[in-house]
Amino acid sequence: AIVSSDEATIEFAVNLGPDHAQLDPTGRLVAINTGTLVASVGTASIVDTGSKPSGGAALNWGRWEGPGSTIAQQLPNGAVVRNDGGNLHYIYGVVASELPTAGIVEYAPVGGTRPTDSATGEVGNLVSGGRVAVNFTIAQVTLNSLQVGFNNATYTMGGTASLLGPLFSTGGAGATATCTGSACQP
């Protein structure tokens, strides 16, 4: 699962069972406890939900919106960041039984949540899903030309990340972002 509620908090979790992630009967994430991230949807709305099954695997996504949720994450330095009532984006999947072990495969987005501004909560739009290329030979993923738009600001993002243990990491300088428009924020 990948869960994020603001620019400072993103959580990658693997092999989450029912003790750590709770789903409602339709497969929407309603609570998660990874040890460093503890969140519950409470009375907040779950929006932008979707699912894409394929070949025995499936991706599922959604976003919590509005007051009523509790979201707390402990950062590596021990500080706890709270974003109660904020947007929480999630994506989780059933692992595919067959994946390539070598070569490069390009993927196109099949769906997802609308982007949100972590400072204001404004909901934007996906302008372009870009391209995702996975190099299975060297365990690397590259994102090209993902664009999200807000009122008077369009952000274009890209970058390369390598697999470090079970997680992808940009290694500090692997991501780039630009913005056009009068409302661009750092």
Feature-to-residue mapping (PLM):
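Mature soluble binding/inhibitory domains
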Residues: 1-186
